[in-house]
Amino acid sequence: MKHVEINETVKVGHVQPQTDYQFLTMIGRPVTGWKLVVKRIFDFTVGLIGTVLSLPIVLVFAILVKLTSKGPAFYKQERVGLMGKSFNVIKLRSMYQNAEARTGAVWAQKNDPRITPIGRFMRKTRVDELPQFWNVLKGDMSLVGPRPERPVLTEEFSRQFSDFPKRLRIIPGITGYAQINGGYDITPDEKCKLDNYYIKHFSVWFDIKMLVGTVKIIFTGDGAR
């Protein structure tokens, strides 16, 4: 998989915020069926267990974040969810405070200077994503699904890749098929194809395989940026 060139392949810097997004008209019909009910039961059960088990780890890294850089330990950021509905994703802060003051909304890159040393470790091991178990319990997110993007980036990518909004037909996930097979350093077009493949073939068994793959990544540190 090739690395995303922010300034060439995907120009997303300094995208101006707006309220009327064209991608909202390009999503299509939501995914329906009994498999979604099973998926939600699985998500809530595993999400509850994950919340309890990950709490000590989250608290330890929250303290480390506070001790090693200025700013809050956690942050909320608006993301686009099911059928274009916005929600706030919760993460451990892995970047320096006000990191996007100059760059605007851009994808993080490999060796991104905005990422703190402890943040780099958290991204490699996905520890920064652990607070999102709360998003799963609330129903904003699933354990497995297309990773949610920010509204301005979703709009920009949708203008370049017409199938990108179709990723919004299902609840977004903490981890996904694109992350397992391409890591974070893939283009939006590649990510779009992998995510839409997942939507077409998703099942609880598929989700279990993706979760196992994610655990392997956590222990190897592969695929992070």
Region locations from a protein language model:
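C-terminal terminal-structure detector
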Residues: 29-30, 166-225
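Residue-level recognition of specific faces of alpha-helices
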Residues: 63, 76, 91, 114-117, ...
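Glycine-rich flexible loop motifs, especially short His-Gly-Gly/GGXG/HXGH segments used as catalytic or interaction
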Residues: 5-48, 76-77, 183-204
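A membrane-cytosol interface segment of integral membrane proteins
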Residues: 1-5, 144
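Short, glycine-rich, amphipathic interfacial segments at transmembrane boundaries or analogous
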Residues: 6-15, 75-114, 175-193
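A short, structured surface patch at a secondary-structure boundary
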Residues: 108-171, 210-218
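Short, solvent-exposed loop/helix junctions and linker helices
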Residues: 31, 35, 112, 123-127, ...
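A hydrophobic, helix-centered structural microdomain
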Residues: 28-98, 135, 209-225
